[in-house]
Amino acid sequence: MSRIGKIPVTVPGGVDVSIDGQDVTVKGPKGTLALTISEPIVIAKNDDGTLSVTRPDDERRSRALHGLSRTLVQNLITGVTDGYTTKMEIHGVGYRVALKGKDLEFALGYSHPVPIEAPEGITFAVESPTKFSVSGIDKQKVGQISANIRRLRRPDPYKGKGVRYEGEQIRRKVGKTGK
């Protein structure tokens, strides 16, 4: 039995979960999210208001999907109640970010500003010219947008310049030694 998969998913008040076969829809104060669970996994509502995720057999695929499916359902519930936020920061002389309407515009040392459009369900907030955050109810989408932004200018291992997650430790390299 999966250590994560066997834990029941608690559904807080104000959250409505509907299950239709393999489709799970979660409605909460922040919005609605839907997910299709992979075939061997079965999800059911319990009498005490929790959700149980079970697998029919001990095949390798079923074991692999058991804990994953439970965590994905938990992420839906957390998303519609609390939401997800990734805080990011920019290091480097002249590197900055600005909010243009709902979108972000970066100055990252290129000959042109780099715009990033806010997809549906994602909001950007700029705290200072070097600190910003990506927020939304879908954990996967927030993480993917954050990774795409980081990819614009990855942190340099020699000077540490670039876009990074808040608190991320960059492995620094020693430069060439002079004569």
Curated annotation (Swiss-Prot):
One of its GO terms (cellular component) is cytosolic large ribosomal subunit. The keyword rRNA-binding applies. Gene3D superfamilies: Ribosomal protein L6, alpha-beta domain (3.90.930.12). One of its GO terms (molecular function) is rRNA binding. It comes from the Bacteria. One of its GO terms (biological process) is cytoplasmic translation. InterPro entries: Ribosomal_uL6-like, Ribosomal_uL6-like_a/b-dom_sf, Ribosomal_uL6_a/b-dom, Ribosomal_uL6_bac-type, Ribosomal_uL6_CS. Signal peptide: none annotated. It holds the Pfam family Ribosomal_L6. Keywords: Ribonucleoprotein, Ribosomal protein, RNA-binding, rRNA-binding. PANTHER family: 60S/50S RIBOSOMAL PROTEIN L6/L9, LARGE RIBOSOMAL SUBUNIT PROTEIN UL6M. Part of the 50S ribosomal subunit. HAMAP family: Ribosomal_uL6_B (MF_01365_B). This is Large ribosomal subunit protein uL6. It comes from Rhodococcus opacus (strain B4).
